[in-house]
A protein has these predicted regions:
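Bacterial N-terminal signal peptides that target proteins for export
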Residues: 1-11
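Bacterial N-terminal signal peptides
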Residues: 9-19
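Acidic/histidine-rich, surface-exposed loop or edge segments in extracytoplasmic proteins
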Residues: 33-45, 87-89, 197-201, 367-369, ...
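Cleft-lining beta-strand/loop regions that shape enzyme active-site pockets
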Residues: 41-51, 209-216, 231-253, 262, ...
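PDZ/PDZ-like domain segments forming the peptide/carboxylate-binding groove
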Residues: 48, 64-65, 100, 104-120, ...
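Extended, domain-scale alpha-helical bundle/helix-rich regions
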Residues: 123-253, 264
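Conserved functional hotspot residues or short segments at active or partner-binding sites
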Residues: 134, 139-140, 144, 164-196, ...
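Polar, glycine-rich mid-to-C-terminal structural blocks
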Residues: 464, 476, 483, 487-539
Length: 675
């Protein structure tokens, strides 16, 4: 669940696959709707068939897919769908079972009329605004608690969107002249029409789609609304979306290594990916204007058409034409020839550093997701390599594992990463819709690191990150430090996204996971042993703020592995080779936790900058009504990482307390021997 919402700026990582997705994937049709629905119902943890509740959710989500800011549709237009009676909903179900999706066609017709109305309003608004002083006042938020009651209210909301858009770009480029203002209005309209054209069944260039394309996009929107109506984490994806997700999970893609942004002057280079062909050419910089691709002038092309040109799969070489303005305002034009190749996204995988301590170090590892690929890249391997690199410097006396920005990834990697700090034992218990229970185990009889360990978490730590944090907390081998709780995603999804041979792409919630204590992280998240608030602490972030989340429950503990999911032969093998070496629950850190908390509280109370941050967070809490759930303000740049500093201090306390305990144990043993 990348989870932080972007405000206006949308970045596109140009990932060019060898095989064109559009060409290789068949278009959807109405018959696929039933096929996909049946598949998802057969897998889902709770929902097995269409119901009035599912229908109401479908209509609501279909509407919100189009009008999330409530700036197109009137309340009187949407209420018949949002408040549909059970009787009417059963009639919709009967029609859908007969392959009749006319209810959604009528809803789409209503959306098309709303688009025409909005385009007329935008035209009137922009003429008026261009003739007067800019920009006027805008409300601080895009959140609307209700759909507009009147067309005047709609017009005001559209005007407000334009003003916010203008103010966003004004901080990034010169908009003083009438010509520049006209350009920003044109860009605003272009971005809205990009979404509107999908519902008007128009191509990027404004031409009407072919019938098969119309049927495809209509079916795609229904399936997206349907999948999301099952629960908050079930989703249906287009092939393009699935491809992007797969690259995100595998931390690699094939391309030229540029990130594009559509700005006032055209398509800009927003970022050059480290280690990619663009960076290695030494010729491309951020803010360069992309004006040509393989000799094709881009000036009059829609942004999607620019992306399509880059994604063409019939050549390995791409020639980019770029324009650059120097510090004196002088333009220059140049060409760069780049060869597409695989690029590893190393920056978003892991980062490491250390603090010197005596003759050794305290290691710091920040892990941003749980990933693995066919090329041997994995989060487990990267952490092992980091620990080895620390040990080459000197003894590794303690470790901080930072999962504050980690929103999950592969479950198998969560088990393996947990296993680096545990011996044999159950890491995750998974329970599925029909009651089946499975145990995911670490079967390596010796931990890779067993010293003082702090796991840093935040409200943004989710899914696989929560498994690792709670598993290590259950066994008592780590102290959890950070926000009061983590995100709270404790559900399991089956997905076809990583299956390149799949003809449809979805993820569907099939179960919930629990750790060895029998606790689930669903809704409640992982509770910190020592609360050190992060930047995210004051915001409304978490599973509890999503629509249609599953409820939490509890299973019996599995610290003593029951082996009930194994066949007789495997069970005998595990009883001989695995059970004698089970990880024991460590009680020492729990015993000294009051001391660790007291020391931490005293340090933070004496840190004026940390106290200043806490006061600022109180101000943020006072304006949460203007922010949608699961979103945050842009994080300010700061040189101080108070949570990491305190995590290291807690590790230092742990080292001292552990050494003190050993001394006391040795003294007690000597006294016993002497007596």
């Amino acid at each position: 669940m990348g989870i932080r919402q972007a405000a206006i700026k949308i970045l596109f990582l140009i990932c060019i696959s060898i095989t064109s997705l559009a060409a290789s994937q068949p278009l959807l049709n109405s018959e696929d709707i039933h096929r996909v629905m049946d598949r998802l119902f057969s897998l889902h943890i709770e929902n097995r068939e269409l119901s009035p509740t599912i229908i109401r959710r479908c209509f609501k989500l279909y509407i919100e897919q189009f009008d999330s800011e409530k700036s197109y549709l009137l309340e009187r237009e949407v209420l018949p769908y949002l408040q549909i009676s059970d009787e009417a909903a059963f009639a919709v179900i009967e029609r859908m079972n007969n392959n009749d999706f006319s209810d959604f066609l009528m809803l789409n017709d209503m959306i098309q009329r709303a688009i025409a109305r909005a385009q007329n309003m935008r035209h009137s608004n922009t003429i008026q605004m261009l003739d007067n002083d800019w920009p006027g006042a805008a409300s601080p938020s895009a959140i609307q608690s209700h759909f507009a009651y009147s067309e005047k209210e709609l017009a005001d909301r559209l005007k407000n969107r334009l003003i916010r858009f203008y103010m966003f770009h004004k901080t990034r480029t010169d908009l003083s002249s009438t010509e520049r203002k006209e350009k920003i209005v044109s860009l605003f309209d272009k971005k809205l029409r990009r979404q509107e054209n999908n519902y008007l069944f128009l191509k990027a260039n404004g031409a009407k789609m072919e019938r098969k394309q119309i049927e495809h996009y209509f079916a795609l929107r229904i399936l997206k609304a349907f999948a999301k109506s099952l629960d908050t984490h079930s989703s249906f994806f287009s092939p393009e979306e699935a491809h992007e997700m797969r690259m995100s999970l595998e931390k690699q893609f094939e391309g030229v290594g540029v990130i594009l942004f559509e700005g006032v002057d055209g398509v800009m280079i927003s970022e050059v990916v480290k280690g990619g062909p663009a960076e290695q050419s030494g010729m491309i910089q951020t803010n360069d204007l992309l004006v040509e691709i393989d000799g094709n002038v881009l000036e009059f092309l829609a942004f999607e058409e620019v992306l399509d040109l880059l994604k063409k799969d019939n050549r390995r070489e791409v020639v980019l034409g770029l324009r650059r303005i120097d510090d004196e305002g002088n333009p220059s034009f140049f060409h760069v020839t780049l060869n597409k190749r695989p690029i590893m996204l190393n920056e978003s995988r892991i980062s490491t550093s250390f603090e010197k301590f005596g003759d050794g170090v305290i290691g710091k590892i920040s892990l941003y997701s749980f990933y693995e690929s066919n090329d041997g890249i994995s989060s487990e391997k990267d952490i092992k390599d980091a620990i080895r690199s620390f040990q080459k410097i000197g003894p590794l006396y303690g470790l901080v594992l930072d999962l504050r920005e980690n929103s999950g990834g592969f479950l198998s990697q969560a088990v393996k990463v947990s296993g680096l700090f545990l011996s044999n034992g159950v890491v995750v218990i998974s329970k599925y819709g029909r009651g089946e229970i499975h145990y995911l185990r670490n079967i390596v009889g010796r931990s890779f690191f067993n010293g003082p360990l702090v796991v840093l978490t935040s409200k943004m730590s989710a899914s696989a990150a929560e498994i690792v944090a709670q598993a290590l907390q259950d066994y008592g081998v780590a102290i959890i430090v950070g926000d009061e709780r983590t995100f709270g995603k404790g559900s399991i999804q089956y997905q076809t996204v990583t299956d390149e041979g799949a003809d449809i792409f979805f993820k569907v919630t099939v179960g919930k996971y629990y750790t060895a204590s029998g606790r689930t992280t669903q809704i409640e998240g992982v509770k910190a042993d020592i609360v050190v608030p992060t930047y995210y602490a004051p915001y409304n972030i978490g599973e509890r703020y999503l629509e249609y989340p599953l409820s939490p429950d509890r299973l019996d503990p599995a610290f003593i592995d029951p082996l009930t999911d194994l066949d007789a032969k495997t069970k005998r093998l595990f009883q001989d080779k695995y059970m004698p070496y089970l990880q024991r629950v460590v009680s020492f850190w729990k015993k000294v936790l009051p001391v660790l908390r007291k020391n931490s509280t005293q340090r933070l109370a004496q840190n004026p900058q940390f106290q200043k941050m806490l006061r600022h967070q109180e101000q943020i809490r006072g304006r949460l009504e203007f922010l949608p759930p699961n979103s945050v303000d842009e994080m300010p740049a700061t040189a101080n990482d108070y949570q990491m500093e305190e995590a290291v201090n807690i590790v230092l306390d742990m080292i001292y307390l552990e050494q003190q305990s050993r001394v006391e144990s040795a003294q007690a043993e000597e006294q016993l021997t002497g007596s």
